[in-house]
Amino acid sequence: MSSPYILVLYYSRHGATAEMARQIARGVEQGGFEARVRTVPAVSTECEAVAPDIPAEGALYATLEDLKNCAGLALGSPTRFGNMASPLKYFLDGTSSLWLTGSLVGKPAAVFTSTASLHGGQETTQLSMLLPLLHHGMLVLGIPYSEPALLETRGGGTPYGASHFAGADGKRSLDEHELTLCRALGKRLAETAGKLGS
């Protein structure tokens, strides 16, 4: 049996959400857990996976086993009109078997997102990702205002989870506060999973 891990599951089209996933993974490791970073393949207009089984680069694709066996979950997506991107939704829609068995009940979870514009739907996207987690019975974590960067940020960061203003071309790097908030969220998730597992 493998050691406990936090699954950092995301979809990223231009790389901003992928970078957030890496920073959240750093926070998870600071919290004492292994971070297992996974992504999902793009989908076609027919709503089927259209990428090879193993990606040419970047994180491996997530499996239901990755999700079932995690000690906690960080879920990330770029914003698509205030919602999570369809590849992530497609993956989550296929988790009914885990819901039926209660595999995720009582496990901690957090969400993160990136947007092209400052007011591009960060919080509504985070809320859209929280809904399936609540249906699975997961314990939702956000970022408390005791985290100073949440009060100082001029870009991303919400009490619902980490966020990033990536710019219209998706190339704006995470700023100091966004980095801090990603790592803080990952660390909080790992520490909570540790407390729940003890």
UniProtKB/Swiss-Prot annotation:
GO biological process: cellular response to oxidative stress
Cofactor(s) essential for the protein: FMN
UniProt-listed InterPro entries: Flavodoxin/NO_synth (IPR008254), Flavodoxin_CS (IPR001226), Flavoprotein-like_sf (IPR029039), Flavoprotein_WrbA-like (IPR010089), FMN_Rdtase-like_dom (IPR005025)
Database matches in Pfam families: FMN_red
Keywords: Flavoprotein, FMN, NAD, NADP, Nucleotide-binding, Oxidoreductase
Cellular component annotations (GO), alphabetically ordered: membrane
Signal peptide from the UniProt entry: none
GO molecular function term, any single one: FMN binding
Residue stretches making up the Flavodoxin-like domain: 6-190
Known EC number: 1.6.5.2
Catalytic activity: a quinone + NADH + H(+) = a quinol + NAD(+); a quinone + NADPH + H(+) = a quinol + NADP(+)
Sequence positions that bind FMN: 12-17, 79-81, 114-120, 135
Cofactor note: Binds 1 FMN per monomer.
Domain of life: Bacteria
Subunit structure: Homodimer.
PANTHER family: FLAVODOXIN-RELATED PROTEIN WRBA-RELATED, FLAVOPROTEIN-LIKE PROTEIN YCP4-RELATED
Recorded family membership: Belongs to the WrbA family.
Protein name as it appears in the record: NAD(P)H dehydrogenase (quinone)
Source species of the chain: Pseudomonas aeruginosa (strain ATCC 15692 / DSM 22644 / CIP 104116 / JCM 14847 / LMG 12228 / 1C / PRS 101 / PAO1)
UniProt lineage: Bacteria, Pseudomonadati, Pseudomonadota, Gammaproteobacteria, Pseudomonadales
